[in-house]
Structure formats: C-alpha cells, structure tokens
From Swiss-Prot:
The keyword Transmembrane helix applies. Residues 48-145 form the Ig-like domain. The chain crosses the membrane at residues 378-398. This is Netrin receptor UNC5B. Disulfide bonds join C69-C130, C81-C128, C174-C225, C258-C295, C262-C299, C273-C285, C314-C348, C318-C353, C326-C338. It is a single-pass type I membrane protein. The lineage of its organism: Eukaryota, Metazoa, Chordata, Craniata, Vertebrata. Residues 543-686 form the ZU5 domain.
Amino acid sequence: MRARSGARGALLLALLLCWDPTPSLAGIDSGGQALPDSFPSAPAEQLPHFLLEPEDAYIVKNKPVELHCRAFPATQIYFKCNGEWVSQKGHVTQESLDEATGLRIREVQIEVSRQQVEELFGLEDYWCQCVAWSSSGTTKSRRAYIRIAYLRKNFDQEPLAKEVPLDHEVLLQCRPPEGVPVAEVEWLKNEDVIDPAQDTNFLLTIDHNLIIRQARLSDTANYTCVAKNIVAKRRSTTATVIVYVNGGWSSWAEWSPCSNRCGRGWQKRTRTCTNPAPLNGGAFCEGQACQKTACTTVCPVDGAWTEWSKWSACSTECAHWRSRECMAPPPQNGGRDCSGTLLDSKNCTDGLCVLNQRTLNDPKSRPLEPSGDVALYAGLVVAVFVVLAVLMAVGVIVYRRNCRDFDTDITDSSAALTGGFHPVNFKTARPSNPQLLHPSAPPDLTASAGIYRGPVYALQDSADKIPMTNSPLLDPLPSLKIKVYDSSTIGSGAGLADGADLLGVLPPGTYPGDFSRDTHFLHLRSASLGSQHLLGLPRDPSSSVSGTFGCLGGRLTIPGTGVSLLVPNGAIPQGKFYDLYLRINKTESTLPLSEGSQTVLSPSVTCGPTGLLLCRPVVLTVPHCAEVIAGDWIFQLKTQAHQGHWEEVVTLDEETLNTPCYCQLEAKSCHILLDQLGTYVFTGESYSRSAVKRLQLAIFAPALCTSLEYSLRVYCLEDTPAALKEVLELERTLGGYLVEEPKTLLFKDSYHNLRLSLHDIPHAHWRSKLLAKYQEIPFYHVWNGSQKALHCTFTLERHSLASTEFTCKVCVRQVEGEGQIFQLHTTLAETPAGSLDALCSAPGNAATTQLGPYAFKIPLSIRQKICNSLDAPNSRGNDWRLLAQKLSMDRYLNYFATKASPTGVILDLWEARQQDDGDLNSLASALEEMGKSEMLVAMTTDGDC
C-alpha cells in the first residue's frame, strides 16, 4: 500500500511540472471570455490576499490612466473591465518574494485609454477589477471606476455686483460649472483667497455661496468665484461690492445770540452731515442743516428820579428835608440805576442856626438814637418766641397722629388673627338698606387674578368700572393666587408659592368666621415664606413634563396644550444624558408687558435647564392665536433673561446670520429651532391696525344649584388649547361645567370693546340681575393677552326652586365687529356633573415622554439616505433647497445653509410639524416631485421592515 501511494504522488508531481497554462492564455489572446476557475496547486497554499487594489481614476484630456494590483500568494493576476477579461498583452507583470514568509508576490499593471472609456455604452461608468489565483482558489478586488474628467466653461450662476449699507448682510451666490470630479470652489477678494477661519465675518455655505455677516467699509472690493478640479480652473465674472454709508446729522449746535440787542430779532443753530459723513455714494442727510427762530430781547430800562418832595418842617437842629425816589421809571432788565442823592437837607432859620447842608450819603451823619436800638432788640426777642411756639404745636400734632395710626395697626392685626380674613369664595349677606343694592362703584369686568389685602375682596377693584350691574360680574375664583398681607409684611413682597392652588384643597362648607380655616391660611402663608426656593420647579403635572434623554433624542409633549419639545437624534453629545423638562407658565408675572399695539399670542413656555450644550437645534412647538395674514402682523419671539425682563430674540422676516433661532409659522402654531433652552413667548404687533387675533368663547355654569341664584360665566380666552385646558381645570375646582362647545371669535385691533349680553330669558320664571342691557370688557384688556381667565359673570334669579329649565341666548361680539351667539338650554336638576372630569381626564391627557427612535416618524436609516442625497449642492438646484421649498420651509434659507446638514435640520422641523398625524405622505410627495425616486424605494423598503 505504501509503494502504491508513493507512486501516485510521484505521478501527480510529474503532471504538475509538465503542465503549461499557455493554451488557456492563448484563448484569452484570441478573444476568449473565460479563464479556468482554478489551477492545479498544492492544497497547503492560502487564498490570495490583495496588498494593493485598483483605485478610481480620471482620464485627463487624452492621457491614459494606469491601474495597479498587487497580491500574494498568487500564481496569476488578471484585470477584468466591464465584465470582459483584458488581453494578456495589456498586462505588465512583476514578481517578487516576501523575505519574511517566502511567498511569491505578484503585481500587475494595465493602462486604460480615453477611447476605451468612450466606447462604453450604458448608464454605468467604466470599471475594472483584479482577479488573483492561487492553488486554493480566486480572490476579487474592489471595482475601480474610470471616468473622463472635464470642467465646463460656463458657471450655472455667477455672483452679481451689489451696493449695501454698512453693517448689513451680503449674499453672493455662485454655482460652479458642471464637472467630473465635482469642482472645488473658493472665493477671491481683490485676488486674495478668502479664509473664513481667519476672518469670521465671512461664511462659505454648503452650496458655495459667500455671505458677509456684517458689511464693513473694508469689505468694499471685487469678489470672484473660482471653480477648479484636476482638469481646469474657471473664474466667474467679478462682482463689485460697494459698502456705502448714509450720512447722519451731528447734534445741533447752540443757538446763536439774538440778532438785535433790543426788541425782535432772529437766532439760528446749525448741524452738519458728518455723523457719519456719506461715503461710497451713500445718501446725504435728509432735512435742514440750519434752523432759524424768532427771538425777542427785552430792552434795558435806565432808572430815573421822581420829582423832589416838599420840604419838611424845620427840625430842632435848624434843618428841613426833602426826598425823591428812583421810580420814574425804576431800572429794569439790566438798566442803569439812578445817580445822585436820595435825600437833601438845608438850614431853615435864615442863618440864625448855622448848620452845614447834609445829605443821606454824608459820612458825618448823626448815629441812631438809643431808642431805635431798644426797638430792634425787642422785635428779635418776640420773633424767637413765636418760632418756638410754632415748633411745639407741630410736635404735638405729629405725636397725636402717630398714636392714632399705631392703634389702627393693632386693631387691623388683631382682626386678621381672629377672623378678619375672608376667603375669596365667600359672599357677604346683602344689607337690608335698599340703597346698598345698587352700589355706586360697579364691578370690575376684567380682573383675572387678585391680590388679597386683609378683609377686602381681591376682585372688587375700583379701577376701570362700568356701571351696569348690581352684583359682581367676576365671581371670586378659589383657585386663583392669594397673597396675605398684614401690618408687619406689607411691602416685603413675600407671598404664596407660585402655582399653588390653595383654596382648591380646603374643606368645603367653611366660612369666614371659622377660626380653623383662618389658621389654615396663616399656616400656608408661613410655609410659603420659607419655601421660595421651590418656585422654579415644574410641579403641576397637567402643565409640565420631564424626561432623561441621550444622543438618540426624543420628544416631550404636554397633551391637550399644543406644546412640545423635539430633541433630534444627535442633539445631545454622545455618551451624555440630560434631564430635560417642559413647562407652561401659568402666572401673569411670567408674561411680558404689552406696549402699544403689542399682544401676547402664545403661552409662556419654559424648556430647561438652561446652559446645556446642544450639538444641533431642538424644536419647540407652541400654539398661537394670531390670524396669520401677510402684512398684518409684526411677529417677534421673546425670551426672559435671568433678571426677569424680556428681550427680543428675533423679528420674523428680519433674520440675519447672527439670529440664534428660526421660526416656522403655521396657521395655529409656531415651531422654533433653538440652540439654547430657556423661557420663550411668541408676541405680535399690529401693523397699520389691521391685525386680527382669535378668541375662544366658553360658557360655564354651576353643576349643582340649590339656591335661587344661578350664574353663567362667559370666558374670553386666546384661541389656544393651553388656555382652554387651564380654564377647564379651574372650573373643575369651582364645580362648574361647560354648557356648550367653545366658539371662535375674530377680534380686530380696532380699539372697540368686547360686548356681552343675554337675550330671550323666560321672564315668567327667571329674571336677570343685570341693570344694563349688556356688559363690556375694555379693548386693551382683551388685546394685550396677558390676563388669565378673563371672563364676565351673569347672575340670574329664578322665582322658585321648582324652575329647573333655563333657556337663553348669549351674544358676544366686538363693537362694530364680528360676534357669536350661543343658544343655551340646560336643566338644573340633570346637569352632568362629571362633564369636566371627562374632558380633563380624556385619553392621552397625561404628559408623555417619548425616547429614542419611537419619537420620530422617519426611520434613522431613511433619514441618513435622504441627508446623503440632498446635502451636497446640485447644479440643477435639486437638493435641500428644493426640499425646503416643497415643504414650505424656505422663508430664510441662509439659516439652514449655515448648518452641517441642512437636510437634517429641515427633517427635524418636518418631524415637529407632523406630531399629530405623522404619516410620510407629505415627505414622499415632495421627494417624488423632486425626482428622487430612489428615496421613495428606500422609504418603502425600510418602512416595511
């Protein structure tokens, strides 16, 4: 057996040494299309391993390209191009031995000419591939594609010359000519290459546009777009950018002196157009450089003496006197005083008494007699005594007044501690005096939240009253915030914790005289003073939601409010987790103060915590109540700073590259792309008084009525889901129910009030306590949008408890505007007490948190394919810009152009818009219109999986 096997081995070795593969290779030379799959070899060898594979190449002009391939161990290596074997004559083969392993390394090289590539027909590019043989089998290399390189001469779009004002944004567009490979683009400024890394005022977008963020005078230059690849270099036409400066007036100089020193004249002042001076063709200052005005200088009047008086009787000194005054006229307006003496004297005894003539200004005049000094001192003493008496009287009065105020404070404090505090939902008994049934001070129609000060009702304010009823139009609402003040805490600013519904948890049936209830309020007040640090935490589950997110992203949603926060995939850095929260701020202090025709259009929403590092924008969705008509509104997004004041973030249609966010405005909501979390609110300002905002009218009645009185509360709210949900929760605590489905009212910026009235009341069984025919809410209280739960109350009285049917019409309309009519029909005994509970606890009404891929409609694989296909600029414009246009997101494309993946940001915005329905039909339709059929196939395939 051993001899037989040895003979077989010797025979096999002889055959291997004698075998020649030349016939097969000759078949290749003669046009054969196939090589044997394997050659006889020793079974110990391994499969060939490629050390060098052919790479993609471009044929420049007519120069052929060389393809190299190296493998070991390999007995043969051949190229196969477009499915056909390359002739053996076209191969250049080199062999060497690996010193470490002793294996044979074979390297093969071929050339591919331009003619070979041009002769190829079909849609696929010309390709070549290496096939290496060894005794163990064959190995194929990667495919290398060979293309003919070119670069067309004409640009698809060239930059245009522009003249722009100083500090404005400049956009220079450039679409390079078509070429293979795709041309690289650079910009020249006066023949110097622009490097955005060195000058951050320049920005090169992903579609090769040049943006100057804020034009400077030094940016006045010639700009050229340069496209180049391995074939050629093309230059666009030069675009000249001129940055001009419009002239500005300097401050007015001082008025010149009046032209006339006396009487009417003129004076002028001047200014110059040098702040700044116009440059580079900028406009000259508008207005006058000189102003003139009339002036009147009062003329000076010199004083003049009156006539001398008659001589006085002769004195004991043998002299008599006469006087005169400087009053004819007196000196005025800087005139000169009279010159001369005021008194004159002379001897009156015809020489019997020899006395020299004396005058008032004679230095030898006689001194005052001692009797004059005594009178002077006596007067001073009397004056001192009078002053002391006055001071003592004032001191006594002040002392008595302080004592009286102190007694009052003690009385007020004791009253607050022993039952002086009346809860808001307690109604005092009406006095027997019939005159008191008609108070002179009418109720406040517009108060929506009160501050309780001692025993006075919060909603019984005296401001903005309308005399039309004898009962409060606004019943006190127990769930409103209440601040308790006494003589020791007034002015301290401390109150109950924000958002705490204190009265909603009190035991029913208690009254102001109940000491336990007063003690309960005092306890809550003291507890709130020590818990101020808890005010910022999102505690109300109906208006807040939180979750922990990683790099996969997710979504926070407060159902029933239209408020959500989308955290895209990749927004949070890899390996980090953020605890995010979303909250609707319910207090009026969290809303900005409206000025002029400004109004709050959305709820104030906080997403946090602030200061987190985000790798891509998140999308905050808030509802709004504006009737969006082009040209009627000036929309703004505002944020609340750390100091509490509100700052403007962006004005829509006035965005620049420095704008930190983007707003996508829909008919009833606004989607905001944010780089920073914080507190935001959407506001609007009426443009030329033509804006219209939507109101939501809702009528509530008590679910249980055991008295003769019956009240209807008509709420006038912003037409947002969040506003209605807040009122539903409020009415549930009051024991009310929604009488009829809410209706929408268009409220115009016309300064006209909102009028509410009742009609068709069955007077045989009911009577209205409203003295006037209607009630009105002032226009500004409705328009500013910063007052919560704005409503009016209609109080009715039935003649007997047997009357359980009530019908009427409620008309709500704006004076000289639109209106709505409610037809009410209710049965007091059969009122569905649980209607509000059903609304407030409807399915999906709990806050939701979606994490990871489940929060998104587009699978991640499809999203990546769409981004890879559309992010790169296309000369035909069939890229992300067209997608933004198809999805109506092209209001400000420069925002997306500055992002690393514009398509990804657009898809994030699409995800936020599709929160409710969420099908892919709209996106699929847009891709189909763009001609991206391969994306539709991917969406169908991956979507089914």
